[in-house]
Amino acid sequence: MWVLDTVYRDGVDLWCRDASGTVTRKHYAYDPPFYLHLADPSAHHEMLDVLEAEFKAEPCSFFTLFGELDGFSVHGNRQLAEQIEQQTRFDARLFNVDVRRDQQFMAEQGIFPCGDDPGSRFSADFSCSLRRMEICIRDDPARTPLCTEVEVTGDCTETLHGPGHTVVADLFGLVESIDPEVILMSHADTWLPKFRAFSVEKGLTMPFSRNGKYRQMSSRSYWSYGRMEHKEAALIPDGRVLIDTDESFVYREGGLAGVLMASRLSGLSPNMAARFTPGTLISSYEVYEAVKRGIVVPFRKADAETARKLADLRAADRGGMMFQPKPGIYENVNELDFTSMYPSIIVRYNLSPETLENPSAKGFLPAVLAPVVSLRRETKERKRTEPRYAGIDTLLKWMLVTCFGYTGYKNAKFGRIEVHEAITARSRDILIQTKDLAESMGFVVLHGIVDCLWVQGSPVEVLQQRIGDVTGLRAENEHFDWIVFLPLNDGFGAYNRYYGRLSDGSMKVRGIAARRHDAPDIIRSMQQEMLEVMCTAKDTGELARVRDKVRKIYLAALQRLPLADPRTLAISRRISRTRYTHRCLEGAAVQAYRDDGVEVAPGMKIRYIVRDARRYQVDPEWRAKTFDVPYYRSLMEKAWNDIAYAFGGRVMRPG
Amino acid sequence: MQIRLRPGITLRVGTFSAVIAPEHVITAALNENPELERFLFLFVCGNYSRLISHIGRTASSFEVRRPFTADQLLTVIREAAHTIIFIEHDPSLFETAERLLEPVGSALKEAGREALVVLYAPSMDRPFAALARQADRLIEIVNTGEPDPRQRMAAVRSGHRADGRPQAQTTLEVQ
């Protein structure tokens, strides 16, 4: 049974695809109970009588992460669970209240989406040959009621152009005739509600869903890794996969293969997997695994950290280890990178909420993360020669990155802050151990960030081997012919701003305009052009010889600047708020959007061009006609300074 | 056992007090009262405590617990068996858990029958007001005296007085 989509509506609907590509709906009656534990059931006997009479409550025992509990199974919904909480003055412990029922059904049945061989869930070799259709809409969804220019690619490419109502009606016709299993559509989640309003008004049937039904996800703004993100409301069709190619992080990073892999692991429909963050995916994966193993999932996160002495807390809560680099240019440098360091630590050191008190028990987190870690090792290796594994590898990388942060997340079902701290404590020990080891073997340690170490010296293969032996973790090596560690404003080395030439002839760049999404195109492409020239230099001697050529790129860009197309100067920002107490360019941009009738929400991305920086005057990208030349010249100069440092800094050679 | 916040303002065992005060007043009250070392002290704060890095208490009787959800806060209060329970208010805990304001307030009141319970915030907000409704006393100390040393440093850096007014020019500019 190859499941393409899953929905819970008075039972579970599985949309299954057969070998011929026909998709049909299978309905299963399913009404799982949630579980209730009371410290003193006799104190709530009246409530239990009602639950027994009206909600089929029955005494039972069930397994939590920390062991077996006696309690009751109750057939009811979340609302009932919340009433029980109120009634018991929040003494009740509830489980399996908010697990997605379609996911729970599949976990219990041992099936998963996008695959039909039960043994292949952790395999990177699965079919992605779905009938797909790409819909590229040229219009701006924030400013136009209906699209007027659309390119549709199925078996062939068609362009639809004309009045909105005609284009949308034609698009509906194409979806119906091609009948794709997967639709990849730009800004799908913004367009679909508009299409629905149009279809209701004109009496048309919107053909994205196979049975005319849509699930609704509401819009929200949320904090993720220190920045505000915004998710549009979404209409999700039944029986067909619809991916918003602009908004889906998983699709952007991992492509369709990444979305399908996320769905296979998490047990969520690809429609949901495409719309969730890696953090939600890893948590869904843990929930699927818990249900599969017969462990109930807590409804509320009520178990707080244990009481600690202040000194213990200060010692434990210190995060990752850093070694600050000395800014400069270095030749023959090796970057040793621990593959999936934090998840590997969880697995190797058996770190899980329940093993903190009972270290000899086999931990839930290590058990469920181990197959993902080994799958990541495999895809990381295979993508070097087979690019089709790159999307899956990236998805796994993100899921594993977030699995660590998730242990400390306040609402993590299977997280606990002490586990988070134990992981970082181990990582600090490992990085220090590795540094000491490298230095004892005659290497010079230049820089270190959490799970990476930059060293000069040889033989690096022996060092790698020794690191593996001592730490039990695998360290990958990338060799730089030369690398530039940039300075901070105060002259000390920046942790995360560097670039260099790898021995395969490519450049690795971090933290400068060429890699920053917020930098204007004109500056990003200027720096990329410079780096392409620098990439031809195999050592610092050759690098010095391309200086004039690189400088010419800068001077030419400066000269062209006054005549540049304003759209190439757009600055992208993800806004964290919509009200600003101080005057700033970002605040002016938010106001400019509003003046043009575009509603903004925290987490949304905006693009603006600076018309007059001193007066805080900016224009949205679509309105810009002029720009502040001196302001952009200063941005260009900053970008040049990052590059020019490679020609002026001190060269450090090994030994 | 009591904590002296200001002359004439003391907090005693067997009460639940809601206190609004400048941070330096509270840290001074916690750091400069050696008698507190003799009692079991539980300091409760969220993920972004403004006080904890300024507390110089190292006694083994001084313990910290950090709830990151309102449900965890309720558990922490219910499990506390300390003589002094000090809660640094974190409004973010209640952003999606307003349902717990009343039970948490009641748990603080209940704990205040046996212990000295302090709910502290530097300024009033809606969750604090809801929790403080069940307090025996609401104490607000307004910063009229000497400024917080940290505030003073920030003012010096920004070229303003600690009260926010611009500093007068003290040297002549040389062209």
Task: List each language-model region with its residue ranges.
Chain B
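N-terminal regions of ATP-driven nucleic-acid and macromolecular assemblies
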Residues: M1-Q175
